[in-house]
């Protein structure tokens, strides 16, 4: 399995093309990247949770795409760390539940190691929330399990300004419930981003055993 860090922002459509090729050839790969301002709707999206018209999004330079991942609407923007994980569950004999639990556990442990920040999950609303304020969401999750090969993944709010979230009710909740490392007054510098990625690699390796780390 390869782990690739993209230093430049990746267009969302380019990612959709990449994940289809990875699934077609069942090539395992973990990607770390950022997107330009983008709104995506999952297979369970509620039209009422899109608060503005597509024409307004276009005028603001915000893309909108419909995807096959689970969940409702979410947003991507610069400063948000996106982790896309492509894993062959069939080959590894892993259950969907095991994969999701360990993906979230990897993020929880990595964030705690990086900032001493405690996160919790919510079985009624996927994602990760502040233990000190469970209404505040800092990490979104949406995964596709087609053919028992995963795609999409998690989006962690690091230094993004959260403005794109104002156009939606993310996962059906008010956008004001979203927070970020920056909003919490914690160090969000590049060295912290790199530290978080390093921790994520280590924790993901503990249950996926990836190899061949590279950068792009």
From Swiss-Prot:
Entry keyword annotation includes Acyltransferase: yes
InterPro entries (UniProt xref): aa-tRNA-synth_II/BPL/LPL, BPL_LPL_catalytic, Octanoyltransferase, Octanoyltransferase_CS
Record's catalysed reaction(s): octanoyl-[ACP] + L-lysyl-[protein] = N(6)-octanoyl-L-lysyl-[protein] + holo-[ACP] + H(+)
Entry keywords, A to Z: Acyltransferase, Cytoplasm, Transferase
PANTHER family: LIPOYLTRANSFERASE 2, MITOCHONDRIAL-RELATED, OCTANOYLTRANSFERASE
Site feature (Lowers pKa of active site Cys) residues: 137
Enzyme Commission number(s) of this protein: 2.3.1.181
UniProt cross-references to HAMAP family, sorted A to Z: LipB (MF_00013)
Active site: 171
Enzyme class: transferase
Pathway: Protein modification; protein lipoylation via endogenous pathway; protein N(6)-(lipoyl)lysine from octanoyl-[acyl-carrier-protein]: step 1/2
Protein name according to UniProt: Octanoyltransferase
UniProt keyword DNA damage, yes or no: no
Family: Belongs to the LipB family.
Domain BPL/LPL catalytic: 24-212
Record-listed substrate binding positions: 69-76, 140-142, 153-155
Gene Ontology MF term list: lipoyl(octanoyl) transferase activity
Subcellular localization: Cytoplasm
């Amino acid at each position: 399995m390869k782990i690739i860090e993209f230093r430049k922002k990746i267009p969302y459509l380019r990612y959709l093309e990449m994940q289809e090729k990875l699934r077609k050839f069942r090539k395992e790969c973990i990607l770390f990247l950022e997107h330009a301002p983008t709104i995506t709707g999952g297979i369970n999206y509620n039209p009422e949770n899109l608060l503005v018209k597509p024409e307004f999004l276009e005028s603001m330079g915000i893309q909108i795409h419909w995807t096959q991942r689970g969940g409702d609407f979410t947003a991507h923007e610069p400063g948000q760390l996106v982790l896309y994980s492509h894993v062959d569950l069939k080959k590894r004999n892993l259950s969907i539940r095991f994969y999701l639990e360990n993906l979230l556990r990897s993020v929880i442990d990595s964030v705690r190691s990086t900032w001493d920040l405690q996160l919790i999950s919510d079985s009624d609303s996927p994602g990760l929330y502040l233990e000190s304020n469970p209404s505040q969401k800092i990490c979104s999750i949406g995964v596709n399990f087609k053919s028992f090969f995963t795609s999409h993944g998690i989006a962690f709010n690091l230094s993004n300004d959260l403005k794109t979230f104002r156009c939606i009710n993310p996962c059906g909740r008010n956008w004001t419930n979203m927070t970020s490392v920056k909003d919490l007054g914690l160090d969000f510098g590049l060295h912290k981003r790199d530290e978080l990625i390093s921790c994520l690699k280590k924790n993901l390796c503990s249950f996926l055993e990836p190899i061949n780390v590279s950068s792009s």
